[in-house]
Amino acid sequence: MSVNDPLGDMLTRIRNAQLRGKSTVSSPASKLRAWVLDVLQAEGYIRGYEKKETENGQGELVISLKYFEGTPVIRELKRVSKPGRRVYMATKDLPSVRNGLGVSIISTPKGVMSDASARSANVGGEVLCTVF
């Protein structure tokens, strides 16, 4: 099955798995998805992930979800820049998610990073998603 928005598909899989209380969720592998998962792991929103090879050679990312006292750590996961409407922002315009309690994930020329990292590196880019 063809997916128009692979990153949006992965975020939806994570959101749905947490609503069901699953400990892990799988998603087809890609570099962008892995980079976003690296940021989520560094910010403490997921336990981690591992890449497993599949028969078709694409690979699969198995994501370990994180809970605190039975409640999902990720309360809100929103896709900002979509295939039909890309959202780019300069460093000074990067959004603050829930007054700094959440994180925006930005794709910059220096790689995929959190909004705080992008501000400290003084780079802007495409706002992929927000996490709270």
Curated annotation (Swiss-Prot):
Give a yes or no for keyword RNA-binding in this entry: yes
InterPro entries per UniProt = Ribosomal_uS8 (IPR000630), Ribosomal_uS8_CS (IPR047863), Ribosomal_uS8_sf (IPR035987)
From the UniProt record, which GO molecular function terms apply?
rRNA binding; structural constituent of ribosome
One of the GO biological process terms: translation
Q: Which GO terms describe its cellular component?
A: ribonucleoprotein complex; ribosome
* Disulfide bridge partners, by residue number: none
Q: Provide an example Pfam family for this protein.
A: Ribosomal_S8
Keywords (A to Z) from UniProt: Ribonucleoprotein, Ribosomal protein, RNA-binding, rRNA-binding
Quaternary structure and interacting proteins, as annotated: Part of the 30S ribosomal subunit. Contacts proteins S5 and S12.
Known function: One of the primary rRNA binding proteins, it binds directly to 16S rRNA central domain where it helps coordinate assembly of the platform of the 30S subunit.
Entry's NCBIfam families?
A: PRK00136.1
Which HAMAP family does this one have?
A: Ribosomal_uS8_B
Family, as annotated: Belongs to the universal ribosomal protein uS8 family.
This protein is called what?
A: Small ribosomal subunit protein uS8
Give the organism, scientific name.
Answer: Cereibacter sphaeroides (strain ATCC 17025 / ATH 2.4.3)
Give the source lineage, highest ranks first: Bacteria, Pseudomonadati, Pseudomonadota, Alphaproteobacteria, Rhodobacterales
